Amino acid sequence: NPCCDAATCKVTPGSQCAEGLCCDQCKFMKEGTVCRPARGDWNDDTCTGQSADCPRKGIYG
């Protein structure tokens, strides 16, 4: 993984993240980027722009 220094188990200089649904090419995806599409009665889950995690909103559409 080019975003992760295997020797230190930390992200490489200039990288924000190494993995996650909201991580793309070592950077956090923009706020509002759909990271988990709507399913059934649930709305899309979107990235915050501040984390590599895809938060579950748990809001009905």
Swiss-Prot record:
Transmembrane segments: none
One Pfam family hit: Disintegrin
Domain Disintegrin: 1-61
InterPro entries on file: Disintegrin_CS, Disintegrin_dom, Disintegrin_dom_sf
UniProt GO cellular component terms: extracellular region; plasma membrane
Localisation per UniProt entry: Secreted
Keywords, ordered alphabetically: Cell adhesion impairing toxin, Disulfide bond, Hemostasis impairing toxin, Platelet aggregation inhibiting toxin, Secreted, Toxin
Domain of life: Eukaryota
A GO molecular-function annotation: toxin activity
Free-text tissue specificity from the UniProt record: Expressed by the venom gland.
Disulphide linkage map: 3-26, 9-23, 17-23, 22-47, 35-54
Keyword Protein transport attached: no
Chief location: secreted
Chain ranges for the short sequence motif Cell attachment site as given in the UniProt record: 39-41
Record has Disulfide bond as a keyword: yes
Cross-referenced SUPFAM superfamilies: Blood coagulation inhibitor (disintegrin)
Subunit structure: Monomer (disintegrin).
Note in the entry: The disintegrin belongs to the medium disintegrin subfamily.
Protein family (similarity comment): Belongs to the venom metalloproteinase (M12B) family. P-II subfamily. P-IIa sub-subfamily.
Function as written in the Swiss-Prot or TrEMBL entry: Inhibits fibrinogen interaction with platelets. Acts by binding to alpha-IIb/beta-3 (ITGA2B/ITGB3) on the platelet surface and inhibits aggregation induced by ADP, thrombin, platelet-activating factor and collagen.
Protein's name according to its UniProt entry: Disintegrin atroxatin
